[in-house]
A protein has these predicted regions:
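Alpha-helical structural signal in soluble globular domains
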Residues: 172-180
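Feature activates predominantly on carbohydrate-active enzymes
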Residues: 1-168, 178, 187-190, 209-213
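Substrate-binding cleft/loops of secretory-pathway carbohydrate-active enzymes
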Residues: 187-219
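Short conserved micro-motifs at the rims of enzyme active sites and ligand-binding pockets
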Residues: 221-223
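Extracellular/periplasmic catalytic domains that process cell-envelope and extracellular macromolecules
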Residues: 111-112, 181, 201-205
């Protein structure tokens, strides 16, 4: 299977998992399959439709709209507010959750048939380093709870601090949109910087669905 796309990557793509019966049996009938081959017919249960799936912070709070007048909405990283590349947000700024919730409401109105909507952190690890965010990381941190990992993964997540900030951000969004869309589900990535479970969060909103990905974990130890 030859891959042809806009960005360089391996020349061959493993395709066995795009068989409809296999996809249905392994419960992989979600957005990744939808993007690739549009498989999984109604005979096999159809696709799970996820609106705005992926690393979508730039869609939740568009830098083209807000960066010039409100650089404080974006991550303070290495003493600079960054809006380029794989964007981070200042998740503790109260305006950011409100803007993201408004974006989410717009998506829900525009795509009423979606099974889930999404909050997707970036791959970059560009967590905001402002004073308020750092204080929140400390609040949610589990200093002694890092599991067995390999390589650079041992430095992830400020021991659960970022996961706590991200979940609180997602809770705020879910609470705000529930007024208009009480039954809509919102997916959220938990991986890399948000992989370690935080302390001091006892409950997440009933409409939040956790996408847990143990990337970088050794297979020799339990989750």
């Amino acid at each position: 299977w030859m891959y042809v796309g806009g960005a360089p990557r391996t020349g061959y793509w493993w395709r066995d998992h795009f068989d409809e019966a296999y996809v249905a049996r392994t419960r992989h009938s979600g957005q990744a399959v939808r993007h690739q081959l549009q498989l999984t017919s109604n005979e096999y249960g159809g696709l799970v439709k996820i609106s705005h799936w992926g690393h979508n912070f730039k869609e939740l709070v568009p830098p083209a709209k807000y960066a010039n007048d409100h650089p404080e909405y974006f991550a303070l990283y290495k003493e600079q507010r960054t809006t380029s590349g794989d964007l981070g947000l200042c998740l503790t700024h109260p305006d950011v959750a409100a803007i993201a919730a408004q974006s989410m409401r717009t998506w829900m109105r525009e795509d009423p048939g979606a099974d889930q909507f999404f909050i997707g952190q970036p791959d970059s690890g560009k967590r905001c380093q402002c004073l308020k965010c750092n204080q929140a990381y400390e609040k949610y941190s589990r200093v002694n709870s890092i599991p067995a990992m390999r390589g650079s993964s041992a430095d992830l997540a400020i021991h659960g601090g970022f996961a706590g900030v991200l979940l609180q951000f997602a809770n705020e969004i879910a609470n705000k949109v529930e007024q208009d869309f009480p039954n809509n589900k919102i997916g959220i990535f938990l991986y890399e910087s948000s992989l370690i479970a935080p302390k001091n969060i006892t409950k997440v909103h009933k409409n939040l669905l956790m996408w847990f990905c143990a990337a970088g974990w050794t297979s020799g130890s339990g989750i």
